[in-house]
A protein has these predicted regions:
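Substrate-binding/gating loop at the entrance of the active-site cleft, primarily
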Residues: 1-2
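Active-site phosphate-binding strand-loop segment of PLP-dependent enzymes
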Residues: 9-77
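PLP-dependent enzyme catalytic core of the Aspartate aminotransferase-like
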Residues: 23, 126, 187-191, 213-257
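Alpha-helical scaffolding segments of alpha/beta enzyme cores, especially the outer helices
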Residues: 24, 52-59, 86-90, 184, ...
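Active-site PLP attachment segment
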Residues: 84-130, 134
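Structural signature of PLP-dependent enzymes
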Residues: 132-151, 157-186
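Conserved PLP-binding catalytic core of the aspartate aminotransferase-like
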Residues: 166-224
Length: 257
């Protein structure tokens, strides 16, 4: 199997990206190293790279001859479908062969179907033929024929201008609701008298947030209030709604005091 290493990404002190550490790690990697990058709506932190940072990543990957594997499970949950795909286009325009793993489970509310796609950008027709041959072998020995129901649903929507327009509108509503929940959580924590600045939650994107809560505080949320979060402090913002936001904010305020 592959030897798997980690590279620096999240900076807890600034609630942002440790970009200096990330670049240093990329520059230390041997050529042909596969590097997994989140194209948008970073999971679990919710902290994304800026366009300028992506440009530096693309240049570094090209110079070091690395192999980017772009994980794009939440396209459309950041700004919009077009903007959220900008990192993929940067690699393609730079002539870099890369792999793109897309998921439609969340954006189409087909979580139980596990619908996705693997797209591979190659440098030539000859490389395409070789990659396709290897993919067929891997697929044949792993699952041979995938379930078709979820994929058929997604294809029907994307190939119909009317259905696609409706889907994009509804996806935008989902995105706006999540952003609203972020805003409400921040404002309600402030109203509860919490002096810690949680404004960073509003700058994060996608379904998740690194809240800054400790594992002990997360345990208290679970044991005392029946609110579940990951031990790292990651919370699912998409699980918040108008009926539970007050309860959650009040509980977080209590474990912080």
């Amino acid at each position: 199997g592959f030897k798997v290493n980690n590279y620096p990404y999240y900076d807890a002190a600034s609630h942002g990206v440790n970009f200096t550490g990330m670049l240093a790690a990329l520059n230390s990697m041997p050529a042909r190293t596969i590097v997994v990058l989140h194209a948008c709506c970073h999971n679990p932190t919710g902290v994304d790279l800026s366009n300028e940072q992506w440009k530096q990543i693309v240049a570094t990957v090209k110079a070091r001859e690395l192999v980017p594997f772009l994980d794009m499970a939440y396209q459309g949950f950041g700004d919009n479908i077009e903007s959220d795909g900008s990192a993929v286009r940067m690699f393609a325009n730079a002539g870099i062969s890369c792999l793109v793993s897309s998921s439609f489970s969340k954006s189409f509310s087909l979580y139980g179907e596990r619908v996705g796609a693997l797209s591979i950008i190659t440098a030539s027709k000859d490389e395409t033929a070789k990659v396709l041959s290897q993919l067929k072998r891997v697929i044949r020995t792993n699952y041979s024929n995938p379930p078709t129901h979820g994929g058929t649903v997604v294809a029907a929507v994307l190939n119909s201008p009317e259905l696609r327009a409706t889907w994009e509108t509804e996806l935008g509503e989902m995105r706006d609701r999540i952003k609203l929940m972020r805003n409400l959580l921040v404002s309600k924590l402030k109203a509860a008298g919490i002096e810690r600045d949680f404004s960073f939650v509003n700058t994060q994107r996608g379904m998740f947030s690194y809240s800054g809560l400790t594992s002990e505080q997360v345990d208290r949320l679970r044991n005392e209030f029946g609110i579940y979060a990951v031990g790292t402090g990651r919370i699912c913002v998409a699980a918040l709604n108008n009926k539970n936001i007050d309860y959650v904010a009040d509980a977080i305020a209590k474990v912080l005091k």
